[in-house]
Amino acid sequence: MSTTIIGFPRLGEFRELKFTTEKYFRKEISEEELLAAAKDLRAKHWNIVKEKGITEIPSNDFSHYDNFLDAAFLFNVVPASVQNLDLSDLERYFALGRGYQGEKGDVRALPMKKWFNTNYHYIVPKFEKDTQVKLAGHKIFDEFQEAKELGLNTRPVLVGPFTFLQLSDFEEGVKADDFVDSLVAAYQEVFAKLAELGATRIQLDEAALVKDLTAEEKALFLNLYNKLLADKKGLEVLLQTYFGDVRDVYADLVNLPVDAIGLDFVEGKKTLELVKGGFPADKTLYVGIVNGKNIWRNNYEKSLAVLEQIPAENIVLTSSCSLLHVPFTTANEEFEPALLNHFAFAVEKLDEIRDLDAIRNGQGSEALAANKELFATERVGENAELRARIAGLTDADYTRLPAFAEREAIQEEAFKLPALPTTTIGSFPQTKEVRAKRLAYRKGELSQKEYDAFLAETIDEWIKWQEDIDFDVLVHGEFERNDMVEYFGQNLSGYLFSKNGWVQSYGMRGVKPPIIWGDVTRLNPITVKWSSYAQSRTNKPVKGMLTGPVTILNWSFPREDISIKDSTLQIALAIKDEVLDLEAAGVKIIQIDEAALREKLPLRRSDWYEDYLDWAIPAFRLVHSTVAPDTQIHTHMCYSEFTDIIPAIDNMDADVISFEANRSNLEILDELKAKNFQTEVGPGVYDIHSPRVPNEGEIDNTIEAILAKVPSKKVWINPDCGLKTRGIPETKESLIRLVEAAKAAREKL
């Protein structure tokens, strides 16, 4: 047998790529310096994988921003507005992901969506009528050649043509079938050039095959691959899947003239059953047996039990998905050994893959013995009081009274807000000064009194600024918070926090998910101090800002020893206690963010309710079910596909919900109208994930489009997400335009 991985983290052990790229964005280094630093980082990563004994090393899994965007650039799927910018290739590439606003032009970034059921986001290309698909880039060849010069014959990785078409957008009047022939020709040209450079095998990532597929989608897949595989240009083709099983196309897949198939044996419910039903002797099976999404040690006995049931003769052991979804290494963590031994980050997962391979080959007995010992004892005890509280919950605990319509009238009278009320999602820019003060406080260089004085002064400044530009519902800015999940987790029992456990979320942005180690309870009030302080500084309502239980769970590394449902209910009770304390402190508008609600929705529709929504929605309702009718509950959701779960979202029974909608062209509005959505809505009127400031009239046009679909009495005006990562000048300029546009729209009602 041999070993490999689907992909490796690219930000670097200490987020080197992030910091270098941000220097480039700030024009502190040149394009050449950025490219040189990235080349050094790739060499370092390849060397790590090689030294760990992995026999097949991937290349082109690295990206300066996003692999899906890389594929779009490679195949010339670039809007004319960006093609025409008088910029370098790299500048145009970044313009697709970040937008561009400067002397050469003004273009908006492409949409951004969640990558399947992860917290990674991909950039969504758009096929237009004038799109000419052709081989236009060279990154995949350059990186293969780089590795070859280091003595490594790597396996290049590329998004497969089916997934590329399935996850892209199409201009009205064009469809995926229109681009099959040109896309196949472009892929075959890639094959030919790689073969010429000395490559022997290419990995085509086809994660879209693990979703429910219609007859038309299966036909598209087969049409693409029958044409593509008719001439492989001498390359072996590995068709790699992950995030689930391929039950809809397995029979077709094994009959295609591919040389190898990669399947997920971790998240694929039916993968083992499918393979036991037969796997071709002339193909290699890449067995995704080490979890690429979670950070717990692999249980070797359980993995070996699965491997023993696989009838395939030619096997390569691999990760269940790319390792970009886990942190780099545990080597830089400071946990006690008794804790650390339970964790495997990306580098340690290389060891696990190698160990499993060795054990199967009659070696590795010491590794197996150590692993058995690790799993021989209970890792953590139970909180009996918490378990009893959950067991005692009844239907009434999940039901808020009175019903929405009655609450809406009560709140209208209580708050007396104007039509189209304005607010923001919660956070304001975290400047270098804010971060430096927090760090100094953590290090003990700043006293509690000094730190509190700084936070109070900063909150005062932003409360006054919001009043000055005439916002209707204010926020305190969240300057005391580092991360919307970590901040809460630090005040909950059962949580652990890594020092350097960064994971890429989008572009160069990393998140550091906490680890749910044991049962979760609230230790102390978390947000009451600063939310109530901010409310005391103004007569306007100030929103209390909380992270919801499903998002806290989804943006953490969850336990594997209890169900995620039970873990979420534990978190929900902790956040419920916080909601009630905020209300008691006089905070009458409370936002409970569920930014990641859609994220862990099963990829197959048949699993949506039983496996997820039937407990995720009640968990949210549990949090706010006992607040008074004149307390207004808001929630917020980030980049995801929401249109297919609108009724479930309405059933959360919040009073107001804000969506990301601007970057995806307000697509959700038609569905809100069709489903008679009852909750008041704030479909973000400008995209904060791009540094560009909306043009004069841009927000006005967006509001006009919203009001064409949603009754004005139901509409709130807000950005599409929090402003933590933006600069102060662009934030203030954008928000002033937002308030002006809202006032102008009111006059037209």
UniProtKB/Swiss-Prot annotation:
Pathway info: Amino-acid biosynthesis; L-methionine biosynthesis via de novo pathway; L-methionine from L-homocysteine (MetE route): step 1/1
Pfam families, per database record: Meth_synt_1 (PF08267), Meth_synt_2 (PF01717)
Active-site residues per Swiss-Prot or TrEMBL entry: H689 (proton donor)
Cofactor note as given: Binds 1 zinc ion per subunit.
GO terms of biological process kind: methionine biosynthetic process; methylation
Residues at which L-homocysteine binds: I425, G426, S427, E478, D593
UniProt feature coiled coil, ranges: none
Binding-site positions, Zn(2+): H636, C638, E660, C721
The EC number(s) this enzyme carries: 2.1.1.14
Binding sites annotated in the UniProt record for L-methionine: I425, G426, S427, E478, D593
Group of enzyme by EC: transferase
Cofactor(s) recorded in Swiss-Prot or TrEMBL: Zn(2+)
Cited function: Catalyzes the transfer of a methyl group from 5-methyltetrahydrofolate to homocysteine resulting in methionine formation.
Family to which the UniProt record says this protein belongs: Belongs to the vitamin-B12 independent methionine synthase family.
Name of the protein this chain belongs to: 5-methyltetrahydropteroyltriglutamate--homocysteine methyltransferase
UniProt source species: Streptococcus pneumoniae serotype 4 (strain ATCC BAA-334 / TIGR4)
